[in-house]
């Protein structure tokens, strides 16, 4: 495991005096043209940090360790296994190696955040609220799983930086939102309110009130809530996908319906692959595969119910780790359409779909594990009692099935855990602007860019 940019982009960018004007207009402070590194150049080795060989242990590189912990936490939540609690190696500068665990990473990140109230930086000199909000999600889920309290740094950071990172007029209306902040020169690089969508999506499970404020302001600026205004396709659909996901999460049915209809027409959703068993959004790019990040964001509005994204982090289903579970499915020859426990009926419901015509109707097996009492087991297949199963241990059974479409109802006697995850606190805020707004000074340097000229941000307007 390693971070290529951190290992190779040493010192200032040698090409920073050659950036094209279009790029300068978007990303470089006006008073430092030719003397300032573009976003994306990490500049490992510059002062005051010096060369830091460890991508995780470094003061910067937040976009590596923050996202890494988020992915690791999601992996643990999915599998129920503390995989990253064991030591893993991280590649460093000059072929050095560093041993880390997820738990040490979280302690390090939380400590860094506590010491730097403006937030740890990504590239040297640049703090990104977008990345910090994703890093906060990782801490939030980590705390829920391991019953820790590292996430407290996030709401404290939001309140501490709100009046510096965001621009409000005298009435409290949002005028601009942050892209990055450079603490060495006290410079905010900002865009209009619609840029807030990128932060709102990751902020909503952590600070739903301010996240919704960012979302509503962006929607109004873009005109998505105006049924008389046409929604137009832009070159970059990322923010429209984020808007759709946010609309669903916040229960904004007007915007959700409008953006969903737009996505159906312009995102090119279609099935593909053998027997059309795969699905993706192709965005009319005429490419071999769907774009990964774009398609994944677009799918956020297709899975789960309204509020599911926030509940994943604020009220995760930890009881599932002790619930009866389906294992041993011959994927991808058999697809799992449904597998869930109903604690009220003490029943595990399973729907399987055959996906390989060559193996159609031939025999195979599945396993059900973590059954509390084998003496109470009853199995139904397609609505009828089914006895082609046997115990394989004190809490597991093996069921004979075939490569065909099957519905199983398995009475297990499991009625739910007595205690679920306790991480269910709601951050309540009555005002969008901190009462201490006169304490945090405004930045000495501010540049508000016109994102309508950016090829990757044109869907955002100003």
Report the location of each language-model feature.
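Alpha-helical repeat scaffolds
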Residues: 16-27, 85-87, 152-155, 213-215, ...
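Terminal, non-catalytic domain-edge segments
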Residues: 41-42, 46-49, 74-84, 195-378, ...
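Extended ligand-binding groove/face enriched in aromatic
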Residues: 2-127, 133, 172-175
């Amino acid at each position: 495991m390693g971070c290529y940019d951190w290992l190779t982009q040493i010192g200032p960018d040698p090409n920073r005096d050659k950036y094209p004007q279009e790029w300068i207009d978007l990303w470089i402070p006006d008073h430092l043209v030719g003397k300032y590194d573009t976003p994306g150049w990490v500049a490992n080795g510059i002062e005051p940090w010096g060369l830091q060989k460890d991508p995780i242990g470094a003061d910067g590189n937040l976009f590596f360790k923050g996202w890494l912990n988020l992915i690791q936490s999601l992996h643990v939540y999915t599998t129920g296994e503390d995989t990253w609690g064991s030591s893993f190696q991280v590649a460093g500068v000059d072929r050095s190696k560093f041993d880390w665990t997820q738990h040490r990473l979280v302690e390090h990140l939380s400590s860094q955040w506590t010491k730097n109230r403006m937030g740890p930086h990504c590239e040297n000199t640049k703090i990104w609220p977008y990345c910090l909000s994703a890093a906060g999600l990782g801490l939030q889920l980590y705390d829920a799983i391991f019953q820790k309290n590292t996430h407290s740094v996030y709401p404290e950071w939001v309140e501490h930086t709100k009046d510096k990172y965001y621009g409000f007029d005298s009435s409290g209306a949002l005028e601009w939102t942050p892209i990055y902040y450079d603490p060495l020169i006290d410079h905010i690089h900002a865009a209009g309110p619609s840029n807030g969508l990128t932060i709102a999506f990751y902020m909503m499970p952590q600070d739903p009130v301010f996240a919704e404020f960012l979302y509503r302001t962006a929607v109004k600026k873009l005109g998505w809530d105006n049924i008389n205004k046409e929604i137009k396709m832009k070159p970059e659909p990322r923010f429209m996908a984020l808007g759709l996901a946010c609309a669903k999460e916040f229960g904004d049915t007007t915007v959700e319906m409008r953006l969903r209809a737009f996505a159906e027409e312009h995102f090119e959703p279609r099935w593909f692959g053998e027997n059309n068993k795969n699905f993706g959004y192709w965005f009319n790019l005429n490419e071999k595969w769907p774009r990964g990040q774009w398609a994944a964001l677009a799918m956020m509005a297709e899975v789960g119910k309204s509020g599911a994204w926030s509940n994943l982090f604020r009220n995760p289903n930890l009881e599932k780790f002790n619930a009866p579970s389906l294992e041993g499915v011959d994927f991808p020859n058999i697809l799992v359409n449904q597998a869930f426990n109903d604690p009220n009926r003490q029943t595990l419901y399973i729907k399987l779909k055959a996906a390989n015509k060559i193996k159609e109707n031939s025999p195979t097996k599945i396993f059900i594990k973590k059954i509390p009492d084998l003496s109470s087991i009853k199995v139904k297949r397609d609505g009828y009692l089914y006895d082609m199963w046997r115990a394989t241990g004190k809490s597991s059974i093996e069921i004979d099935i075939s490569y065909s479409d099957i519905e199983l109802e398995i009475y297990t006697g499991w009625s739910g855990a007595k205690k679920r995850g306790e991480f269910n606190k709601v951050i309540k805020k009555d005002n969008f602007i901190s009462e201490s707004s006169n304490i945090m000074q405004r930045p000495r340097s501010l540049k508000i860019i016109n994102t309508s000229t950016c090829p990757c941000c044109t869907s955002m307007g100003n």
